[in-house]
C-alpha cells in the first residue's frame, strides 16, 4: 500500500513524513475502519524508518510474524519481531434466532521472506526473515492458547505449489494447511481467487473458494477487488467451528470497450482523506523538468524501440555513471532497463 504509484514516491521522496503526519493511504484505511493489516514486500521499499513513521498514523494494529530485529532466535516464538505477530480482536456475531454472541478473532500476518534480497540495502543487518509456514506453526497454537475462537491468516504471499518448501515466496497453500488456521486472506501475485486462473491447481477448489480446504480469498491488486469471506459457524462443546463458507473476489470495475466502467460508487469520505496529498502529487508530477529538442511519442512503445522509453533509459545510464564516477567501478559497463509504461500518445 505504500509503493506503486506517483503518490507513494512523492510522499516518500519529496514530502516526507514529519511527526504527526498521516500517510494518505493510512488516512483512507482509518476512514474505512480497518480492524488489522499486515505488511507486503513493497512496504519495505522506502526503508524501515519511513515505514515505522507511516504505521504510527494507523488507528488499527499491524501484525507480522516472520520479520525479526537483528538475527533470528533458535525458535520462532523467541524472535524479537519488528511488529506484533498477531492480535486478537473482539467481534459480535448474530445467530439465526437473532441472538448476539461474542467472538474472539485471532489475526496473524506474514510477508515474503524474499524481502531480504529485494530490499537488501534497507534491511541487511537490521532485520531477518523467517519461513512463513515455520512461523505459523509456532504462533497459531499460541493464539489458540490465548482464547481465539477463530484464526485468520493475513498473508502477503501468493498461491503457488501445494508442496511445502522452506522459505517459499508463494506459500498460501501450505500456510492454509497449518492446523488451527480457519481462513486465509492472501495476495502478492496480483491475481484474484476464487477465479478461473486457478482452475485445476492442486490444493485449490475454485468452486468452493478453498485453499487447502480452508476458505480463502485473493483480492487482485491496487484495490481492484474486494475480498469477501462469509463464514457459517456453530458452537459445539464450548468451541466455535466453521461449518461452511462462501468466498468471493468482487471487482470494483469492469472492462467495456477498452474502458474501465465502475461497478461501485466512490466513498466521499475516503476521497477526502487523501484529497490534499492527491492534489499535491498532481502538482508535483506536472512540473516541467526539462525540454526536448524533438517531440517524443509512445505510439510504438510495445513493438519497437521508442523515444519515450529511450530517454528514460538514457537518464538512468547517466545517473548511474555519475554515481560511479571516481569509484573502483567507474570503468564497468552500465546496462539500463526501461519499460514501456504507456503507449499511444
What are these regions (language model features)?
Residues 144, 250-345:
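Non-catalytic terminal accessory segments
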Residues 1-251, 308-315:
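Acidic, metal/ion-coordinating pockets
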Amino acid at each position: 500500500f505504500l509503493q506503486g504509484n506517483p503518490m507513494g514516491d512523492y510522499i516518500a521522496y519529496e514530502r516526507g513524513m514529519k511527526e504527526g503526519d498521516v500517510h494518505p493511504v493510512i488516512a483512507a484505511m482509518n476512514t474505512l475502519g480497518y480492524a488489522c493489516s499486515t505488511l507486503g514486500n513493497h512496504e519495505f521499499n522506502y526503508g524501515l524508518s519511513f515505514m515505522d513513521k507511516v504505521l504510527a498514523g494507523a488507528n488499527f494494529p499491524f501484525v507480522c510474524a516472520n520479520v525479526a530485529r537483528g538475527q533470528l532466535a533458535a525458535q520462532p516464538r523467541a524472535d524479537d519481531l519488528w511488529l506484533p505477530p498477531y492480535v486478537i480482536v473482539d467481534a459480535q456475531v448474530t445467530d439465526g434466532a437473532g441472538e448476539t454472541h461474542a467472538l474472539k478473532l485471532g489475526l496473524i500476518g506474514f510477508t515474503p521472506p524474499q524481502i531480504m534480497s529485494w530490499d537488501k540495502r534497507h534491511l541487511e543487518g537490521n532485520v531477518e526473515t523467517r519461513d512463513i509456514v515455520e512461523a505459523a506453526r509456532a504462533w497459531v497454537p499460541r493464539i489458540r492458547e490465548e482464547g481465539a475462537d477463530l484464526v485468520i491468516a493475513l498473508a502477503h504471499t501468493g498461491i503457488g505449489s501445494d508442496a511445502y518448501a522452506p522459505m517459499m515466496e508463494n506459500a498460501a497453500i501450505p500456510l492454509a494447511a497449518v492446523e488451527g488456521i480457519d481462513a486465509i486472506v492472501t495476495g502478492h501475485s496480483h491475481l484474484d481467487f476464487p477465479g478461473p486462473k486457478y482452475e485445476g491447481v492442486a490444493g485449490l477448489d475454485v468452486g468452493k473458494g478453498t485453499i487447502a480446504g480452508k476458505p480463502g480469498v485473493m483480492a487482485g491488486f491496487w484495490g481492484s477487488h474486494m475480498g469477501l469471506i462469509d463464514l457459517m459457524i456453530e458452537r459445539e462443546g464450548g468451541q466455535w467451528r466453521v461449518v461452511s463458507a462462501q468466498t468471493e473476489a468482487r471487482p470494483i470495475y469492469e472492462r467495456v470497450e477498452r474502458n474501465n466502467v465502475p461497478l461501485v460508487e466512490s466513498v466521499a469520505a475516503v476521497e477526502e482523506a487523501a484529497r490534499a496529498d492527491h492534489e499535491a502529487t498532481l502538482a508535483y508530477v506536472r512540473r516541467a523538468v526539462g525540454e526536448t529538442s524533438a517531440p517524443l511519442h509512445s505510439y510504438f512503445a510495445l513493438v519497437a524501440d521508442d523515444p519515450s522509453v529511450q530517454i528514460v533509459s538514457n537518464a538512468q545510464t547517466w545517473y548511474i555513471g555519475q554515481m560511479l564516477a571516481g569509484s573502483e567501478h567507474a570503468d564497468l559497463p552500465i546496462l539500463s532497463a526501461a519499460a514501456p509504461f504507456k503507449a499511444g500518445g
